[in-house]
Each structure stands twice: as structure tokens, then as C-alpha cells.
Design a protein with these regions (language model features):
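Short beta-strand/loop motif that positions the catalytic acidic residue
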Residues: 346, 352-354
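Alpha/beta-hydrolase active-site loop
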Residues: 178-197
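Central antiparallel beta-sheet cores of small beta-barrel/beta-sandwich binding domains
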Residues: 1-55, 60-65, 125, 147
């Protein structure tokens, strides 16, 4: 456990908790009492508390969570996560900080253009699109910086890239909390157009991870622009190639239902309870898609009328109510959207990558559909890799932070080889 203490300018004491082994970081807590030699803190979100006294630079005390109590010692210092692939200077390439305007949404996208040595207008450029949830330009998670690692590798192999903070996150402006995949597509289009038209690169493609791959296909499927004379002109917002990492090929509700079932099974939940919850969740999502949130909320009791009256069922029903009442635009768009049509009508060269142990976008669920929709695409399944394309034991999210590898070297090489093969 790592307790992070901070004193604000107004003197207010703050504390957060990290549990690297469990992949949990930044859990907000309360400083109940602190003095020169004593501290009492609590974390209501997880029901954990700690009270201790400092002596000879060590804080000794009792950590409690539910019925569990343990004596622990805290030593001052910082925890340095081992991330050997994170790029460190000096770099054999140059970078430029660039702000790109999306005028239709009143958004400024801040990002990094990475340029290999001796680049020119024919140098291929990859615009990177992050997965779901607001993330910075490095797609940083659990101390890993996948997009920074990819940008570094590509630059060392003669390929330029642009990665940017999601709207409303990092240095980018706008509101990302109410944005849907369609909004992120417009952001990516503005970036792609800028790289092609302002930076004057001829070969510009997209690399999308998870939801970012969906956004890439949505751009790839957009029709060519026609002039009044019915002559086709090249749309500067269409990609010349797509790298789709952990790409979904089924409707969003199917992805979320599968994720929920997987998490329940990982928690050793009995099969009958998993089945009850999956069926109910399917019905809730269907009502949200075809009717509205209010009807979904009002239907929960009827949907769950045959459930047993157990604490587990009660907790799961409470979770269903939260989902039904969630009016977030992103969720309501995502559950009803299928990327199938976009994948089917994308005409540029495509490389799709799946991790065998990905439990967030399972290859078993998505890869057959992708193969059917994109028969000309290069599609590859990587043994032992999870959703971040790290070598993993189980693929569980909790493993992400415990793995030193940020992304498989084989994946990096395959991405570079694909791009080089397209432009030469």
C-alpha cells in the first residue's frame, strides 16, 4: 500500500491511496487527524482506515478494512514503477507540441508530433486515437504509456506520429464527459486533416485502440466528397491506412454484457447468478436502446421478478438500477452502435490486432465478425496478450499495473512493418 500525502496552499491536508499489486491508484481519502507524530486517515470508497504513530522516521499502526486488521509499517519515499519501455532522452528524433482546432465543437486538441530523422512529405504519419475513457496523449494507464512507446518505436523506424490528449483532458479543451464516439471521431478528423493539409504529409493513417479503433473505422467508412460536376476529390479527413488494436466488431451492448459476465465469473459467482444478471442486463440495455431510460428503470422489478432474495441478487439489482438510470450520452450511444457497417465499407488497407487473453474486447467474440466484414484486412491473434497487448497470465485488468512490459515488442514490429509495406 502507498499513501500519498499532500498539503494544499490553503493548508488543507489531502491523501490518496495506491495499491499497485491490485492495479488501483489515486483512491481519494480523508485526513481525519494529523500531527507531528500521529496520523488517522480513512478511505470510505473501499472501507479502509489507518491510524498510526511516527517514531524514528517510521509510522507504525493498524490498517483496518471490514473485519480485517493488520499491523503495518510505513516508510517515507516514492514508489518507482518499473516501465523499461518508456522512452527516455536523448531521442534520435524531434517532437513538436501542436494545438489543433476543432471549430465545430469549440475544442482545442493538444498533442505531440513526433518526426523521425530526415523526414519528408512522403514519410508516413500515424494519428493515434485512444480507447474509452478520457486519457492523455500517451494513453497512460497504471504508469504505462503505450502511445509514447509506440511513437518512439515508429520514429526509430522512419514513421512519424501524432498523439493528442482527449478533449477535456490534459491540455486539450472542451467537455469530454458528455462526448460520444461520434464526437471523438470529429476530433480525430480535425487532427488527420491538419496533419495532411497543414503539416503537408502525403501518407496519413490512423492507429486506434479499442474504442479508438471503432473511431478509425468510422472515419475510414466516410464517403468521398463529390464536386458539383460529380467529380470525386480526395477527402483530407479519410485515412490512407488503419491499424486497429483490440477492435470491436459487434454492437456495444454485446461488449459490455460480455465484460460483466467475465467479471462475475472471475469473482467465482455461481453460474445461475451470472445467467440471471446477463439476461437482465440484456433486457435493460435493449429497453435503453429501443425505448428510453425511464422505461428501463420502471421495468427492473418485472425483469428481476423471479430472482432469489439473496444479498448478492439485491446488490446486482442495485447495479442494474444504476445502469438503467445512467443518462450519460457516451453510454447510450455506445450500447446501440455497431461498427459493422463502418468496417464493411472501409476501403483502405487495414491491420487488425487481437490479444488472446483480452477480456475487454474478446477475440472469440469479435475476430470472426471482423474476418467476415473485412476479408481483405490483415488480422492477427497474439498468444498470451491482454487488452493492452502485454504478455499476461489471465488478462485481468488488475494485472495491468503489475506487468513491467508496456506492449509486446512483436506488436510494435508488426505495426511498423505493416505501415512500411503500405507506403513502399
Amino acid at each position: 500500500l502507498v499513501f500519498n500525502f499532500k498539503t494544499e496552499e490553503d493548508g488543507i491536508q489531502l491523501v490518496t491511496l495506491d495499491s499497485p499489486d491490485q492495479g488501483a491508484y489515486g483512491i481519494a481519502g480523508d485526513v481525519n487527524f494529523i500531527s507531528a507524530d500521529s496520523v488517522n486517515i480513512s478511505f470510505r470508497q473501499i472501507g479502509l482506515s489507518f491510524a498510526g504513530r511516527q517514531q524514528n522516521g517510521i509510522i507504525t499502526g493498524i490498517c483496518s478494512q471490514g473485519a480485517m486488521k493488520a499491523n503495518i509499517e510505513l516508510s517515507p519515499g516514492t514508489v518507482e514503477l518499473k516501465r523499461p519501455q518508456t522512452p527516455l532522452p536523448p531521442y534520435p528524433y524531434t517532437t513538436k507540441e501542436i494545438n489543433i482546432n476543432n471549430p465545430s465543437d469549440d475544442v482545442i486538441l493538444s498533442g505531440t508530433l513526433t518526426l523521425p530523422k530526415d523526414y519528408n512529405t512522403a514519410t508516413p504519419v500515424v494519428v493515434m486515437i485512444t480507447g474509452s475513457g478520457l486519457q492523455n496523449r500517451d494513453e497512460e494507464i497504471f504508469g504505462h504509456k503505450p502511445f509514447a512507446v509506440i511513437a518512439d518505436y515508429l520514429a526509430r523506424n522512419g514513421i512519424a506520429s501524432f498523439r493528442y490528449d482527449d478533449r477535456g483532458h490534459g491540455k486539450s479543451t472542451g467537455d469530454g464527459t458528455t462526448a460520444t464516439t461520434e464526437d471523438f471521431v470529429r476530433d480525430a478528423r480535425c487532427v488527420l486533416e491538419y496533419v495532411r493539409m497543414v503539416e503537408n504529409f502525403n501518407n496519413v493513417g490512423l492507429l486506434g485502440h479499442s474504442e479508438g479503433a471503432t473511431a478509425a473505422f468510422m472515419l475510414g467508412a466516410e464517403p468521398e466528397i463529390k464536386t458539383q460536376d460529380n467529380l470525386c476529390v480526395i477527402d483530407p479527413g479519410k485515412p490512407d491506412f488503419i491499424v486497429a488494436i483490440g477492435a470491436q466488431a459487434v454492437r456495444g451492448d454485446t461488449i459490455l454484457i460480455d465484460q460483466s459476465a467475465t467479471l462475475l465469473k472471475q469473482g467465482n459467482m455461481p453460474d445461475n447468478i451470472v445467467s440471471d444478471y446477463v439476461e437482465a442486463l440484456h433486457n435493460i440495455y435493449d429497453l435503453k436502446i429501443t425505448q428510453d431510460d425511464e422505461i428501463a428503470i420502471d421495468s427492473i422489478d418485472a425483469i428481476c421478478k423471479n430472482w432469489s432474495n439473496t444479498p448478492i441478487h439485491t446488490a446486482l439489482m442495485s447495479n442494474l438500477k444504476k445502469i438503467a438510470s445512467d443518462t450519460n450520452p457516451w453510454l447510450n450511444f455506445y450500447i446501440g452502435f455497431s461498427p459493422a457497417e463502418s468496417i464493411l465499407t472501409t476501403r483502405c488497407p487495414v491491420f487488425v490486432l487481437y490479444g488472446e487473453r483480452d477480456i475487454q474486447v474478446k477475440p472469440k467474440l469479435n475476430m470472426p465478425q471482423m474476418q467476415r466484414l473485412a476479408p481483405k484486412a490483415q488480422i492477427k491473434l497474439y498468444p498470451e496478450l491482454n487488452h493492452l497487448f502485454q504478455h499476461s497470465q489471465t488478462g485481468a485488468v488488475q494485472e495491468y499495473g503489475t506487468i513491467e512490459e508496456t506492449i509486446s515488442p512483436e506488436v510494435l514490429q508488426d505495426i511498423a512493418d505493416f505501415i512500411i509495406s503500405i507506403v513502399h
